[in-house]
UniProtKB/Swiss-Prot annotation:
Residues 6-124 form the Response regulatory domain. Keywords: Chemotaxis, Cytoplasm, Hydrolase, Phosphoprotein. Signal peptide: none annotated. InterPro entries: CheB-like, CheB_C, CheY-like_superfamily, Sig_transdc_resp-reg_Me-estase, Sig_transdc_resp-reg_receiver. It comes from Myxococcus xanthus (strain DK1622). One of its GO terms (cellular component) is cytoplasm. This is Protein-glutamate methylesterase/protein-glutamine glutaminase 2. Its EC number is 3.1.1.61, 3.5.1.44.
Amino acid sequence: MGKKVSVLVVDDSLICRQLICEALSKDPDIEVVGTCADGKQAVEMTKELRPHVITMDVDMPVMDGLTATEHIMAECPTPILVLTADPRSQAPELTYRALELGALALQIKPAIDAGPDAWNLVREIRLLSSVRVIRHLRRPQRGPLLPPRVATSVLPAVSMGVVVVAASTGGPQVLFKMLSELPADFPAPIVIVQHINAAFAESLAGWLAGASKLKVRLAQDGEPLMPGHVLIAPPGQHTVIPFRGRVGIKLGVERDGHMPSGTVLLESAARTYGRRAVGLVLTGMGADGADGLLAIKQAGGLAVAQNEESCVVFGMPGAAVERKAVDHLIHGDEVAATLVRLARGESLSVGR
């Protein structure tokens, strides 16, 4: 099967290191090339071993996982998977801070007789091993972040009824920035499908709520869609918009390998809101959301996707581009500004 996926396991608990290694041993194509008990060792061993993926604990002696993540992403960028025993036992801002610093994903530590947790870990490691990470500078640089974009055509402004979003790997970071920048009087409801381990769904909503002037929470079946409110799709079910002004939560089958599915949400918004739907597909692996974005475009709504330059993984937006489902490609840093312009009735220029 070619070269094995090399993994560095970082955790101050010997038992946890052993359990992680045992879980990864279930896949013959994954090789643990090193283990260590603190962040300082992790930085040194990353430079020496150049692993494909690092599993990172947060709370460790000598150097914690956050500081180690910051050093690694600045000095030797490597896909980092943050592991935690229980999201509810730790302040969510600590775990999610690792994502802000460049870690790619969150996962539950495997326990004895872990079962699904072990296989979820293996699956995540295999996925992250193919991600091309970027260097995260430890000090912000001055000057313009992006060159000016040249418009190739002009789209009419959209009367915004609802904003629906699909995101996966790298999505929490983009959502955090988007929601932290949107004003409290943003005039449309926002509904988001973010692929994440079910155990992290509630803490994700809390983390995003703490950054935003909007009211952010997990969606509940039958609740109203209101301006200034952001609903996060709960795990294990599909979130839909069955009719205007109301959200629905329903059981079903996976779509594009996911439940909740971004495509299911976006298609329901296309049916219900038509031209007043704004669809947004952000960074992520796979193709979820692409067919849903096409449905919004065909219904006369506005179809927006994150550009390759700013994606951790261009899979989902790339699939939308391949389907010719995208009206407008934007940088991940420009999502909030784009939505505000639409809300003000301004036209968007299309360019890559």
